[in-house]
Amino acid sequence: MIILGIDPGIAILGYGIVKYEGNKFKVIDYGAIKTSSKMATPQRLKEIYLRLDELISEYQPDAVAIEELFFNTNTTTAMVVSHARGVAVLAAAIHEKEIYEYTPLQVKQAVVGYGRAEKKQVQQMIKILLNLEQAPKPDDVADALAVAVCHAHSGHFQSLFKVK
C-alpha cells in the first residue's frame, strides 16, 4: 500500500509518501510545499493544489491521510489553513483516492506511543521507524510522514477514519 501523508498548512504543507508492505516501511518521497506570504491567498492555494496534483499523479497513492486541524486561539490562521486542507482533500478527491483523517493525538500515539509527545520525539521516531539518516525537517514534513505511518498502523480500523 502506498500512502500519501499530509500535514496541512498555507505557508508550509508537509507531505510524505511511504510504501507499507509486509509490516515494513519504505520511504518513497517527502518534502514541503512552501508558499510565500507575499502571494495572494488564491495563488497560494493554487500552488498547493498543483503540486499535490503532480505528486498524486506521479506516485498514485492508494490512500491519502491528512492530519486534522487543531487551533485554539487564532481563528484567522485556522480559516486560511482550513482552505489549504480543503485544497488537499480536493486534489485527492479529483484523483478518486481514499481520504482519511487523524487527529494530532492519534498520530503521536501511533508513532511515539504517547499522545502528548513533543515534536522532537515525533521527528526522532520517524527517523528510526523509516530508517532515515536524519530527522526530516521542517517539522511539517516529519508530521506528514507520521500521519502516513499512523494510517498504516490503523489496519482494520481504517474505515473509522475515512472522510465521508
Curated annotation (Swiss-Prot):
What InterPro entries does this protein's entry cite? Answer: RNaseH-like_sf, RNaseH_sf, X-over_junc_endoDNase_Mg_BS, X-over_junc_endoDNase_RuvC
Q: Name one GO cellular component term.
A: Holliday junction resolvase complex
**Record's CDD domains?**
RuvC (cd16962)
User: What are its E.C. numbers?
Assistant: 3.1.21.10
As to how many cofactors bind and how, the note says: Binds 2 Mg(2+) ion per subunit.
Catalysis performed (reactions):
Endonucleolytic cleavage at a junction such as a reciprocal single-stranded crossover between two homologous DNA duplexes (Holliday junction)
The entry lists its GO molecular-function terms as: crossover junction DNA endonuclease activity; DNA binding; magnesium ion binding
Locate the active site. Answer: 7, 67, 140
**Which UniProt keywords are present, listed alphabetically?**
Cytoplasm, DNA damage, DNA recombination, DNA repair, DNA-binding, Endonuclease, Hydrolase, Magnesium, Metal-binding, Nuclease
Which GO annotations describe the biological process of this protein? DNA recombination; DNA repair
Q: Where in the cell is it found?
A: Cytoplasm
- Residue positions annotated to bind Mg(2+) 2 are 67
Instruction: Answer whether the UniProt record assigns the keyword Hydrolase to this protein.
Output: yes
Task: Report if keyword Metal-binding is assigned.
Answer: yes
Give me the segments passing through the membrane: none
Question: Which top-rank group of organisms is this from?
Answer: Bacteria
Q: How does it assemble?
A: Homodimer which binds Holliday junction (HJ) DNA. The HJ becomes 2-fold symmetrical on binding to RuvC with unstacked arms; it has a different conformation from HJ DNA in complex with RuvA. In the full resolvosome a probable DNA-RuvA(4)-RuvB(12)-RuvC(2) complex forms which resolves the HJ.
Described by its record, this protein's role is as follows: The RuvA-RuvB-RuvC complex processes Holliday junction (HJ) DNA during genetic recombination and DNA repair. Endonuclease that resolves HJ intermediates. Cleaves cruciform DNA by making single-stranded nicks across the HJ at symmetrical positions within the homologous arms, yielding a 5'-phosphate and a 3'-hydroxyl group; requires a central core of homology in the junction. The consensus cleavage sequence is 5'-(A/T)TT(C/G)-3'. Cleavage occurs on the 3'-side of the TT dinucleotide at the point of strand exchange.
Q: Which NCBIfam families match?
A: PRK00039.2-1, ruvC
Q: Per its UniProt record, what HAMAP family does this chain match?
A: RuvC (MF_00034)
Q: What is this protein called?
A: Crossover junction endodeoxyribonuclease RuvC
Organism the protein comes from = Alkaliphilus metalliredigens (strain QYMF)
